[in-house]
Amino acid sequence: MLDQGIGARVLRKEDDRHLHGRGQFVGDLAMKGLKEVAFLRSNLAHGRIRTISKPAGKEALIVTAADLKTIKPIFADSSIPGFKASNYPALATDKVRFVGECLAACIADTRAAAEDLAEEIEVDIEELPAVIDSLKARAPDAPLVHDDWSDNLFLTTSVQGDIETLAKTAPVKVTRELRTGRQCMHPMEGKGVLAYWDFQSGQLVVYTSTQVPHMIRTGLSETLGLEQRQIRVIPPDVGGGFGYKCVLQPEEIVIA
C-alpha cells in the first residue's frame, strides 16, 4: 500500500471528533432567547384552503401565508430545455398540493409548546381529487397540480436524429416499459434551521443543515428581498443528505 498519491490509504479526519461526541449539528446549537418553531402540515394530498383560524389571544405566535405577503415564493426553475417553471410558496396559500405541505408556523419557548399550539389551529380545506400515479396524471381529465397549467407535464424533451431509420436497420430490437419507484432519502439527521439577525454586522445569519450553502443564500436573497451580502449561511456538521439537502426548503424561508 502506498503512503501517498493514488492508491494511498487516507485516514478520515472527522471520525475521532464524532466518535467522542464533539460534533456540532444544528440541533446542538443554542443561544439566548432562542425560540422553537413547529409547522402545521396538510394531511390531504390535494385541497383548496377555505380558512385557517388562529386560536384567540395567540395570533402573534402563529404565522400563515397571509402574514408573508411580502415574501416571494420559491421559483422552481431549471436550465433543462423544455422545463416548465412554477412557484412554490413558503406556506400554502390557495390550495395544498401534497401531504405534509406547510400551512402554518407556530412559535413557542419549547418544542412541545410549539406542537401544542399547532394543534389549536382550525383549518377548513375542501378536499379535491388527487392522483399519485404519474401515468394517470397525464390523462386529459386528471386533476391539475397548478390551476393555471393546461396539464401536469413539467418537462417535455426530445431526441435529435433519424431514430426511425436507425430502428428499422437495427439487428436487434428490444421494447421495454420501464418504471422507477419514488425516491426518498433518509439521512440520520433531518432538516434543521436556526436563524437570527446580527445587528453588529447587519446580516441575517442562518445555520442550516444543507449541502449547498451558496444556493441557500441565493434563494433566501430572492425570496426575502435582501442582498446576498446581507445573508450569511453557515452549514455546521451535516448528518447525511444524499441530495435531500441540495435544495432550498420552504421551512428555511419561514424560519429566516
Descriptions of predicted regions:
Residues 76, 139-224:
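Helix-loop-helix junctions that connect adjacent transmembrane helices in secondary transporters/permeases
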Residues 1-149:
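Flexible, low-hydrophobicity surface segments
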Residues 28, 168, 246-250:
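Residue-level recognition of conserved structural "scaffold" positions that shape functional pockets
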Residues 4-11, 34-35, 65-77, 160-166, ...:
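A generic short-segment signal for beta-strand/edge and adjacent turn/coil regions
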Residues 39-69, 103-125, 193-256:
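Alpha-helical support elements that line or immediately flank enzyme active sites
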Residues 24, 35, 91, 101, ...:
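Short beta-strand-initiation
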Residues 24-27, 85-90, 164, 189-192, ...:
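Short hydrophobic/aromatic-rich motifs at helix boundaries and adjacent loops
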Residues 14, 154, 232-236:
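Exposed boundary/loop context
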